[in-house]
């Protein structure tokens, strides 16, 4: 009975995902990331459109930044997706 109760508590905590925050890359290195502050629910990656499509900026955002004629911005909502 105790095992069942403990299992239910663990499953409840995992399902509720208490205190979940988004994690986004914030450098060009793929293994470095930061936890986004409250209210910033998107990860973004800005890359040069020409010639090499090199990432110029990554981070967290409340809204997706706009692309320009030189920079393409891609936004996503899952951990480390940028």
Swiss-Prot record:
GO molecular function terms attached to this record: toxin activity
Signal peptide range in chain numbering: 1-21
Tissue: Expressed by the venom gland.
Cellular component, GO annotation: extracellular region
Protein's UniProt keywords contain Secreted: yes
InterPro entries hit by this protein: Cytotoxin_Cobra, Snake_3FTx, Snake_toxin-like_sf, Snake_toxin_con_site, Toxin_cobra-type
Major subcellular site: secreted
Localization, UniProt: Secreted
SUPFAM superfamilies named among the record's database cross-references: Snake toxin-like
Name of a matching Pfam family: Toxin_cobra-type
UniProt key word Secreted: yes
Disulfide bridge partners, by residue number: 24-43, 36-60, 64-75, 76-81
Keyword terms, alphabetized: Cardiotoxin, Disulfide bond, Secreted, Signal, Toxin
UniProt record similarity statement: Belongs to the three-finger toxin family. Short-chain subfamily. Orphan group XV sub-subfamily.
Protein name: Cytotoxin 7
Organism from which the protein derives: Naja atra
